[in-house]
A protein has these predicted regions:
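Bacterial N-terminal signal peptides
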Residues: 9-19
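Bacterial N-terminal signal peptides that target proteins for export
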Residues: 1-11
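Cap/insert and terminal regions of metallo-dependent hydrolase folds
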Residues: 111, 196, 202-292
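Active-site environment of divalent metal-dependent phosphoester hydrolases
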Residues: 38-39, 67-69, 93-98, 119-122, ...
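Conserved beta-strand hairpin/beta-sheet module of binuclear metal-dependent hydrolase folds
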Residues: 28-77, 190-209
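Boundary at the C-terminal end of the N-terminal hydrophobic targeting segment
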Residues: 23-25
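Active-site metal-binding motif and surrounding structural segment of the metallo-beta-lactamase
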Residues: 68-113, 117-119, 224-234, 238, ...
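Metallo-beta-lactamase
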Residues: 118-195, 202, 286-297
Length: 297
């Protein structure tokens, strides 16, 4: 009987060790894709992707610009995308969405949240009957559908596989995990909706942005419906072409108006903004190049 007790004890110890290892698992963000890095194992390219791990959920946010580079970086960082719970595509631009080709190859039925956008092609767009602007005086041969219009016109999908869910409002996709829906008000991008990942954390809201086409302050305003206290922002702030005086005003606003505690900027934030954010936030500026893994409390 002694060997049995010994085996039982060993098994129990292993079981407890397994539970313990899960209990201390850290919430974290791993940057999979960006144009800057200090990690020689990854390939740099313009675009953005991050793996977000929080409260047992694994979320892929954006997929980068090139499916081959995306695949390379994912494998170089030993990330298993078949184990993600769902994916989010922030907006339709190819430097955020092209890596879907690789994701859907290895996990074809994955749930992918995308912004409701008539031009994104992810879930297929739907246009109302009034879209046709009927002109009854035309001969039948010149009229769409011989003048007998379907009630709705549904466009095709760019991807044959994947479970695409269109989001057009603030949506809670898991307990404490939200998608913010904003639309750019900048001229020539008025039609561009964007999703931001917002997670309730013990110190405030954790935000992951793709490009912030809507403007980071517009996004923070939308986020206040979830939690008025933003803790940290990851990702692109779209300041790469913004004049320096405007960057200075925004950085001051992030720190003093919005009381943002930490920043981990990347992608289209731009080097002038990197510099000014680093000066303003000091030790609360977190380097977030491709291959970086940042723990979030």
């Amino acid at each position: 009987m002694k060997p049995i007790r010994g085996l039982f004890g060993l098994t129990a110890a292993f079981f407890l060790l397994t539970i313990s290892s899960h209990a201390v698992a850290k919430d974290r963000v791993t940057i999979l894709y960006d144009a800057f890095s200090d990690n020689k194992a990854v390939t740099r390219d313009w675009g953005f992707s991050a793996l977000v791990e929080h409260d047992g959920k694994r979320i892929l946010f954006d997929t980068g610009n090139n499916p081959e580079i995306f695949e390379h970086n994912v494998k170089a960082l030993n990330v298993d995308l078949t184990k993600i719970d769902f994916a989010v595509i922030s907006h339709r631009h190819t430097d955020h969405a092209t890596g879907l080709k690789y994701l859907l190859k290895i996990k074809p039925d994955v749930t992918v949240y995308v912004p409701a956008d008539g031009d994104n092609g992810f879930g297929g767009s739907e246009f109302p009957q009034v879209f046709y602007r009927p002109e009854p005086s035309l001969p039948v041969k010149m009229r769409y559908f011989d003048g007998t219009y379907p009630e709705h016109l549904r466009s095709g999908k760019l991807y044959a596989t994947g479970n695409f869910i269109l989001v057009d409002k603030l949506t809670e996709v898991a307990p404490g995990i939200f998608l913010l829906y904003t639309v750019s008000k900048i001229p020539r991008t008025l039609e561009l909706p964007e999703l931001t990942l917002a997670i309730k954390g013990p110190h405030g809201l954790i935000l992951v942005d793709g490009c912030s086409h809507s403007g980071i302050e517009e996004i923070l305003q939308a986020a206040s419906a979830v939690d008025p206290h933003p803790y940290i922002v990851f990702g692109g702030l779209h300041l790469v072409r913004t004049p320096v005086p405007e960057i200075d005003v925004l950085v001051d606003s992030l720190k003093n108006k919005w009381k943002l505690e930490k920043v981990a900027p990347g992608h289209c934030t731009g080097e002038p903004a990197f510099l000014r954010l680093q000066k303003a936030f000091g030790d609360d500026y977190l380097y977030a190049g491709a291959g970086t893994q940042i723990e979030i409390p």
